[in-house]
């Protein structure tokens, strides 16, 4: 089949996940046209796919953040300012998809390709983790009503891939489905993570792309612990703190050998750490409902803890409980990406056998 694959560019986790699914689709004989938004996602996808699939940049909806919080007003302003240029670029890509003869659309939280599927009456499959907010039952953790920013997050989530024929939701927590046309699978991980083995050492990995100065201030007050820090924007050694340049292979090796991980509560970092059996201190972005949801489940399952901010007492308290978190992680349901691939294959197979 000729499959258009949409990838949202907010963060790199969506692109990393999409690479795995797209490579699987190519291996199954499908042709793929990738439409990716954001600054880094198109380049990452093109590099990882190596010409096996056509990758086209698009202009997606842009989310603006202020002091770690989602700014709805600024997001609207930014999107309106880019509307004319965005339309020209996007129209070129959609015309290319028409001329190519697209037969189905898969979207990883990307709204333009979802709109394209609906406007062309093409089958649409959504594959992402974000739909867990609205399609899974979270009563085990007290529901989602109290999550910061949840009202806006629900609206954005529903608007990304509305009316998809099916939703494949990747999740690390055992929440049952609450809506039809929903399949839950474990997280889709990079092959390098799946191949890595746990070998805990003494260091703690800290990864933070925002509010890095506050994190470093806290780490300096815990001199008894060696830290390997990613996301600082510089490299070097500052006493017990090593500032690391980002390298995929080294990062995975540092995580698999870490005593623990401190970082944001994004889905990719958290699920890679949990798969490797590494306890996590998660610091969700203020007003980012999905990260707060991840943190609540992390805490509920005993795999780590959450914190609104990081200071020395919080770090020491977390490390004092890290053995208990590691013990809980021994029961974490690990596995490869095959369940997710099977779900995608099943859906595409049904579309091929019954195109109506």
Locations of regions flagged by a protein language model:
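Conserved nucleotide-sugar donor-binding subdomain of glycosyltransferases
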Residues: 71-104, 111-112
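Conserved nucleotide-sugar phosphate-binding/catalytic loop shared by glycosyltransferases and other
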Residues: 9, 27, 32-84
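Donor-nucleotide binding loops and adjacent catalytic segments primarily
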Residues: 22, 186-260
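A short, glycine/small-residue-rich beta-strand->loop->alpha-helix junction that serves as a flexible
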Residues: 7-19
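C-terminal amphipathic helix plus adjacent low-complexity
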Residues: 316-356
């Amino acid at each position: 089949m000729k499959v258009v694959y949409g990838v949202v560019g907010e963060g790199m986790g969506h692109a990393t996940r999409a690479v795995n699914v797209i490579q699987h689709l190519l291996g199954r004989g499908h042709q793929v046209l990738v439409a990716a938004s954001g600054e880094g996602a198109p380049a990452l996808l093109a590099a990882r796919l190596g010409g096996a699939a056509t990758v086209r940049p698009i202009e997606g909806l842009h989310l603006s953040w202020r002091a770690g919080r989602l700014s709805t007003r600024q997001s609207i302003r930014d999107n309106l300012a880019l509307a004319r240029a965005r339309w020209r670029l996007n129209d070129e890509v959609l015309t290319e998809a028409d001329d190519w003869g697209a037969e189905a659309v898969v979207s990883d939280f990307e709204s333009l390709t979802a709109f394209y599927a609906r406007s062309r009456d093409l089958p649409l499959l959504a594959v992402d983790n974000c739909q867990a907010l609205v399609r899974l039952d979270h009563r085990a953790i007290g529901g989602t009503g109290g999550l910061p920013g949840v009202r806006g997050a629900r609206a954005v989530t529903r608007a990304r891939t509305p009316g998809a024929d099916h939703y494949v939701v990747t999740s690390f927590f055992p929440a049952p489905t609450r809506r039809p046309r929903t399949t839950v699978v474990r997280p889709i991980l990079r092959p390098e993570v799946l191949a890595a083995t746990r070998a805990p050492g003494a260091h703690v990995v800290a990864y933070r792309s925002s509010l890095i100065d506050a994190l470093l201030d806290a780490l300096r007050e815990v001199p008894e612990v060696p830290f390997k820090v990613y996301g600082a924007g510089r490299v070097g050694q500052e006493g017990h703190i090593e500032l690391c340049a980002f390298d995929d292979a080294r990062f995975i090796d540092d995580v698999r050998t870490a005593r623990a991980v401190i970082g944001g509560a994004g889905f990719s970092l958290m699920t890679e750490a949990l798969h490797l059996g590494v306890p996590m201190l998660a610091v969700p972005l203020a007003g980012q409902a999905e990260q707060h949801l991840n943190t609540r489940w992390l805490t509920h399952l005993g795999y780590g803890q959450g914190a609104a901010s990081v200071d020395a007492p919080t770090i020491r308290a977390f490390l004092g409980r890290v053995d208990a978190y590691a013990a809980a992680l021994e029961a974490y349901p690990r596995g490869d990406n095959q369940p997710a691939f099977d779900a995608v294959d099943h859906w595409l197979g049904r579309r091929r056998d019954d195109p109506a």
